[in-house]
């Protein structure tokens, strides 16, 4: 019905008092089963939809959501997530939504545990988590479940943890897409390089692991003859060490022209290629990080895949708001668009598009 339905109208249809309707709508006690059924029948017949926004405003309760994410230094992907989250907070200020950001040191389990302990001690209404390793994150989410605190996962999907919702790319599809795009320019090659950044011999991001599965699956099915040579640039190394490793690699692989990384650090290789004047080699990577964009425009990076980080940050806060404040159902899995950036279109990328 287009007309506004009043409590008085519902009471007349159900043949009960206005007070009875009010108690049913707000799930209060002291209503007989017969009266409740009459009211519920009237609500269904009149297609009544409660004004959840008005109810939330009238409730006049403040809510605090925590965003637990890696500490970073001017890294565009994480900055955009923060900006999106804080924009959502700003737009919901009438509902007294407060978002607090807590930073943990990347790839540092004790740091993650310390921060999630502080988060739990603060008794938040909801939490947004950029996951660490699976079992470490599980320790946190198990405690959230124990305290009935809803949480949303951002960036990496771990469905076994039973989150309220997830926002990020479909990592397998993203990796497969990356392989398909790379082969548009490298299908005649005999060998390509896959650059990784590892710690203690393993990739620390579940998202990157899943991207690699998708990448290799596509390559195996469509270009099995192309050799994939891995190059590790250890996370704990400094830039000068990377340059030494890269110089040795490209000197010993003079016929290799195309590389890819499934993380946001394509600029490490891209910058090296520029300052060593290797104009016949390119790398493909992820994320519209400032240094990546510079290399993309100068030609050492061939393509970038964007993840709509701003949208992720905004949507995570909005999902907690809708689930906790408005008591609405939310989508459990929300995959971000897989967007391809070239030097010709990178300046038109709308990072804040919602």
Predicted feature locations:
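Hydrophobic alpha-helical segments within soluble ligand-binding/sensing domains
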Residues: 166-193, 242, 308-325
């Amino acid at each position: 019905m287009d007309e506004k339905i009043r409590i008085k109208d519902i009471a007349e249809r159900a043949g009960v008092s206005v007070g009875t309707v009010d108690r049913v709508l707000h799930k209060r006690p002291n209503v007989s089963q017969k009266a409740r059924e009459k009211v519920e029948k009237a609500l269904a017949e009149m297609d009544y939809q409660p004004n959840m926004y008005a109810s939330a405003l009238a409730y006049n309760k403040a809510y605090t959501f925590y965003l637990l994410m890696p500490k970073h230094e001017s890294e565009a992907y994480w900055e955009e997530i923060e900006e999106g989250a804080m924009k959502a907070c700003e737009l919901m200020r009438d509902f007294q939504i407060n978002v607090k950001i807590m930073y943990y040191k990347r790839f540092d389990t004790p740091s993650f545990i310390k921060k999630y302990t502080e988060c739990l001690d603060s008794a938040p209404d909801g939490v947004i988590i950029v996951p660490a390793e699976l079992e470490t994150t599980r320790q946190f989410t198990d405690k959230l479940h124990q305290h009935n605190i809803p949480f949303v996962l951002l960036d990496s999907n771990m469905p076994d943890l039973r989150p309220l919702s997830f926002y990020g790319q479909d990592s397998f599809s993203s990796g497969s897409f990356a392989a398909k795009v790379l082969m548009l320019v490298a299908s005649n090659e005999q060998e390509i390089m896959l650059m990784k950044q590892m710690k203690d011999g393993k990739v620390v991001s579940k998202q990157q692991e899943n991207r690699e599965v998708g990448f290799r699956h596509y390559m195996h099915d469509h270009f099995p003859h192309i050799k994939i040579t891995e190059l590790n640039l250890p996370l704990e190394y400094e830039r000068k060490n990377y340059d030494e490793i890269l110089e040795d690699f490209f000197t010993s692989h003079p016929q290799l022209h195309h590389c890819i990384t499934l993380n946001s650090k394509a600029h490490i290789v891209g910058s090296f290629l520029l300052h060593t004047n290797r104009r016949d080699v390119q790398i493909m990577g992820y994320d519209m990080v400032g240094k990546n964009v510079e290399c993309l425009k100068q030609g050492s990076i061939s393509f970038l895949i964007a993840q709509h980080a701003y949208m992720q940050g905004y949507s995570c806060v909005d999902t907690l708001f809708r689930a906790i404040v408005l008591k609405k159902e939310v989508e459990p899995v929300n995959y971000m668009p897989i967007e391809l950036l070239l030097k010709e279109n990178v300046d038109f990328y709308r990072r804040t598009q919602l």
